[in-house]
Swiss-Prot record:
It comes from Arabidopsis thaliana (Mouse-ear cress). InterPro entries: AAA+_ATPase, ABC2_TM, ABC_transporter-like_ATP-bd, ABC_transporter-like_CS, ABCA, ABCA2/9/11_C, P-loop_NTPase. It is a multi-pass membrane protein. It holds the Pfam family ABC2_membrane_3. The keyword ATP-binding applies. Belongs to the ABC transporter superfamily. ABCA family. CPR flippase (TC 3.A.1.211) subfamily. ATP binds at G564, P565, N566, G567, A568, G569, K570, T571. Residues 963-983 are annotated as: Disordered. It is found in: Membrane. This is ABC transporter A family member 2.
Length: 983
């Protein structure tokens, strides 16, 4: 099958990624709806606020042109309850001068003759003099709107004074002027009744009125002008937060990393996001303008449609570039909302400064204006201000498209920035953010902690693709130390040495075996020591050698299984081969392409498939859509994609679930889909990193069948913690530990070389010699037969069977031994004899234990062994036989020892599973201390403290005795390679 290349592949990837973005947005309907229609709700809110403001001023003449004001004739004294802010019960007015009977009569007349209503006596309070009134007012605030002070000077002269609080009050948009509302009614009432009293005519009256000056319409407060910039910024924040969240989610879940391993171009990735977000931005800006016109705002009606639309679209488009850039520094999608709120808060503050005239006035320097204009909300706010000023009065025509480069009407800034200038600023800063986004995306650590040099774009190799594939580890603000070289150690295993010699010979001669898919040449990976500078602290890390020179061939049409405990270097090897991690030393050729060349890596990614350890899937996409996406990324011809997807779904038995979203899949279905993704496009090399983790047995068996069927025509590299899986699927197995290859070969080869020996399982008939039951007497002859001929005892026994471990050095005796045993089956009551090799798990544990023990001898890593006696000792990780200090007795002058049993925990690390019963230490066995004096043991929890009792390490080469019991059950698999003898 011919795959797409060059520009056609770029266009195909772009189309597939664009469709992926469209589907994700379509299926996140709530988020997409808010992004597009948030402007409607904010504009509706502005409309309601504007309507409320207009209603509150409806009775006021301030917003009207008044040429002939209407006079207000003799207004009455209002009830005190009409005052905006008053404490109840209150008084309509208070007065002083109550020692005068004439003054008292005048006040009574004021109360009686108040137009429209008389004032009850309980609503008025009298005092002797103004000082008494002041004292009462200070003690009783907000109880009365005004006071009258009368002084009877003689029979014909009565003077008075009025006391009110002259501060205007405001409540819910309405103003209360005490002069007009309280002072003038009190003044008219006092003068009227004083005049009637002095002339003696109670019916005397005159008309007194007052009116405001003629005035034009006062410019009203427009809600859109005051709160519009903040609301429109909030509208844009919806798309901003969603964009950052989408980018970070793909990075956090390693979805982008998966696409990179499959060969996606960065250009296609960023262009697909830019195009889709640009479309959403254009729709959002269009709807914003249409909603503004629908609510009849002059801002949208008078200004030219393209002028307003372009301002909103360029602003939101600018925020896309800002979101791209900020996403490079954020690692958690949950932080997207926090970042969005912070940008909104900063934008709100800077918009307030911009609305006050800073810095878009001639008194500010161009440098300040340029720096201020880099932040998108600032130029957007200034653009809104210019458009609002152009429609501030009914006579203002707004800004047309042809006059966008001219100074707008009512521009009080000195015309330092026109609408056209704002367009150019928004467009220019978008390209600035976008270029910075691409730059920071390359120099900030990705999900694997890898980044490029900060000067990567200055290197010719980056542009030509021939200068290597140089990347670095660590953050931007970390100082990477020198990488210490890896000391070459000649392998002590003959198979590993033979493999290394063969690869070195091919490398020196420049030969490439046509039957070899992957040739690893001294691959080394060291994480350098770094110094990270943070706030008031400095963190240092030491160099760590993850791979210490790996040499091996992986043949075509074979499945190579890479085993090893946690930290062995399996995943690091895969990450180096797939280009996720840079190699420190050595190289690897995949079908003749070097992983250290960017051109070679580009070719490699076209021919590999990867099933990561954890499912890397979009919950919102179906299984069929996943396969179509990755098929397009791999460059399959468009005409063959549908048929290839149907075939892949059928292979993993997901045809019926192909159109169901992956988020609804079970764990097993997701793993099957991940395997299908790795096999899409018929890759020549497939990496399967623990493909059956967490599967139920039935699903696991089915996935094994899939892997077996797809082995032909390609090479497969498998990592797993399941020894059964490795035994069944692999053609060759390599076991790694501590960054080195410890053994390599077929399963049979490894079992025969590293197993404890042969496993003999003897099954007994239900009755012996017609006794009706199998007692212990019927098994004793068998035990004696094994002990006399092979010097072994059973490691496990019950009334139905016995299990013996026969050392390899007895292999030459087995033929005659089992021939005689088979001849005596009836005598011994034996129903079945099985002979097999040790299990692969035992081989793995032996290799892992040895590596851990070597490491413990260097760094003193210890773990606690709890004995059945209740005591505990510190032992090196991986030690098999341990002498117990302080157990010397007359019966056992050298003390006792135990065999420690090890197993893998759920994370793949070695842990203690139990130990044998205590046994005497034979005289011929040399013993050594696990840690040299003063070395300072460190346990697995990393604690240093008081020195505990340390066990004595016994070399297993000398421990050739037999074992008869343990504190934990140890069973041996009866499946696999075995010979079966039955009567």
């Amino acid at each position: 099958m011919t795959l797409q290349r060059g520009l056609p592949l770029l266009l195909q990837q772009y189309t597939a990624l664009f469709k992926k973005n469209l589907l994700l947005s379509w299926r996140s309907k709530r988020a997409t709806f808010l992004q597009l229609f948030a402007s409607f709700f904010f504009i509706l809110l502005i409309f309601c606020i504007q309507a409320a403001m207009e209603k509150s001023f409806a009775s006021s003449t301030a917003l009207k042109t008044v040429t002939d004001p209407t006079a207000l004739i003799s207004p009455p004294i209002p009830p005190c309850e009409d005052k905006f802010f008053v404490n109840l019960p209150c008084y309509d007015f208070v007065w002083s001068g109550n020692r005068s009977s004439k003054v008292t009569q005048i006040v009574n007349a004021i109360m009686k003759n108040n137009p429209g209503r008389s004032i009850p006596i309980e609503k008025v309070r009298s005092f002797v003099d103004p000082e008494a009134v002041d004292t009462w007012l200070m003690a009783n605030p907000l109880l009365v709107p005004g006071a009258l002070h009368f002084i009877e000077r003689n029979a014909t002269v009565i003077s008075y004074g009025i006391q009110t609080n002259s501060t205007p009050e405001m409540n819910r948009g309405r103003f209360e002027d005490p002069t007009f509302k309280f002072q003038i009614p009190l003044q008219i009432a006092a003068e009227r009744e004083i005049a009637r009293s002095l002339i003696g005519d109670p019916n005397f009256n005159w008309v007194v009125g007052f009116k405001e000056f003629p005035h034009p319409t006062i410019e009203a407060i427009v809600a859109l002008d005051t709160i519009g910039p903040t609301f429109f910024l909030a509208v844009a924040m919806f798309g901003f937060v969603l964009q950052i969240s989408s980018l970070i989610t793909e990075k956090e879940l390693k979805l982008r990393q998966a696409m990179t391993m499959m060969g996606v171009f960065d250009t296609a990735y960023w262009l697909s996001w830019l195009t889709w977000e640009g479309i959403l931005t254009a729709i959002s800006a269009l709807l914003t303008v249409l909603f503004g016109m629908m609510f009849q705002f002059d801002f949208f009606l008078k200004n030219s449609f393209p002028v307003v639309f372009l301002l909103f679209m360029l602003f939101q488009f600018n925020l896309i570039g800002l979101a791209f850039m900020l996403s490079a520094f954020i690692s958690k999608s949950t932080s997207a909302t926090t970042v969005g709120f912070f940008v909104f808060l900063v934008g709100f503050v800077t918009q307030l400064a911009t609305s006050s005239g800073f810095p878009y006035a001639k008194k500010y320097s161009r440098m300040i204006r340029a720096l201020w204009s880099l932040f998108p909300p600032n130029t957007f706010s200034q653009g809104l201000k210019l458009l609002a000023d152009a429609t501030s009065t009914p006579q203002d025509p707004g800004i047309s498209w042809s006059k966008r480069a001219e100074c707008g009407p009512n521009d009080d800034t000195g015309c330092v920035l026109t609408i056209n200038d704002i367009y150019l600023w928004l467009l220019g800063t978008f390209f600035l953010w976008f270029v910075l986004a691409l730059y920071f995306d390359n120099i900030t650590p990705n999900a694997s902690g890898v980044r490029k040099s900060i000067f990567y774009f200055l290197k010719p190799g980056y542009w030509t693709g021939k200068g290597g594939n140089r990347v670095e580890e660590g953050g931007i603000c970390s100082c990477i130390g020198s990488v210490p070289p890896v000391d070459h150690i000649t392998p002590d295993d003959e198979d590993v040495l033979e493999e290394e010699t063969l690869v070195k010979q091919h490398s020196m001669e420049g030969l490439v075996d046509p039957n070899v898919a992957v040739q690893i040449r001294g691959l080394a990976k060291t994480y350098p020591g770094t110094t990270k500078f943070g706030c008031c602290k400095c963190k240092k890390t030491s160099p760590f050698h993850a791979l210490k020179g790996l040499w091996m061939n992986i043949a075509k049409d074979q499945l190579f299984c890479l085993l090893g405990p946690n930290g062995a270097g399996k995943t690091t090897t895969i990450n180096c081969l797939t280009g996720l991690f840079p190699v420190t030393g050595g190289d690897a050729l995949i079908y003749g392409n070097s992983i250290r060349s960017s051109v070679g890596m580009s070719n490699i990614r076209k021919m590999i498939g990867v099933c990561p350890q954890f499912d890397i899937l979009w919950d919102a996409l179906s299984g069929e859509e996943h396969l179509k996406l990755f098929a397009s990324i791999k460059g399959l011809p468009p005409s063959s994609i549908n048929s290839m997807v149907e075939k892949s779904l059928a292979e993993v038995k997901l045809t019926e679930a192909g159109k169901i979203r992956a988020g609804s899949y079970s764990g097993g279905m997701k793993r099957r889909l991940s395997v299908a993704v790795s096999l899409i496009g018929d890759p020549k090399l497939v990496f399967l990193d623990e493909p059956t983790t967490g599967m139920d047995p039935i699903t696991r068996r089915h996935v094994w069948d899939i892997i077996q069927e797809t082995k032909k025509g390609r090479a497969i590299i498998l990592t797993t913690h399941s020894m059964e899986e490795a035994d069944i699927l692999s053609d060759r197995i390599g076991i790694m530990a501590k960054g080195r290859l410890r053994c390599i070969g077929t399963s049979i080869r490894l079992k025969s070389r590293f197993g404890t020996g042969f496993i003999a399982n003897i099954s007994f008939v239900e009755s012996n010699n017609h006794n009706g039951e199998a007692g212990s007497d019927s098994r004793e002859p068998v035990k004696k037969f094994f002990k006399d001929h092979l010097k072994v005892k059973p490691i496990e026994e019950n009334k139905a069977f016995m299990t013996f471990v026969i050392p390899h050095d007895k292999e030459n005796l087995l033929t005659s031994f089992f021939a005689e045993l088979q001849d005596r089956e009836e005598e011994f009551g034996i129903s079945d004899i099985q002979l097999g090799l040790a299990t692969l798990e035992e081989v793995f544990l032996n290799i892992a234990r040895k590596a851990e023990l070597e490491s413990a001898a260097v760094d003193g890593t210890m773990v606690t062994l709890d004995l059945t006696s209740g005591s505990s000792v510190e032992i090196p990780v991986g030690a098999r036989f341990i002498g117990i200090p302080g157990t010397e007795t007359a019966e056992n002058p050298r003390g006792v020892m135990v065999e420690v049993y090890w197993q893998q925990d759920e994370s793949g690390s070695l842990c203690i599973s139990g130990h044998s019963t205590e046994m005497p230490i034979p005289e011929n066995i040399p013993v050594t201390d696990p840690v040299a004096p003063g070395h300072g043991g460190v346990n697995l929890l990393g604690r240093r403290g008081r020195r505990q009792v340390q066990g004595i390490v016994i070399d297993p080469e000398f421990a050739t005795f037999t074992r008869s019991g343990s504190t934990s059950s140890r069973r041996f698999s009866r499946s696999g390679s075995s010979r079966r003898f039955s009567s």
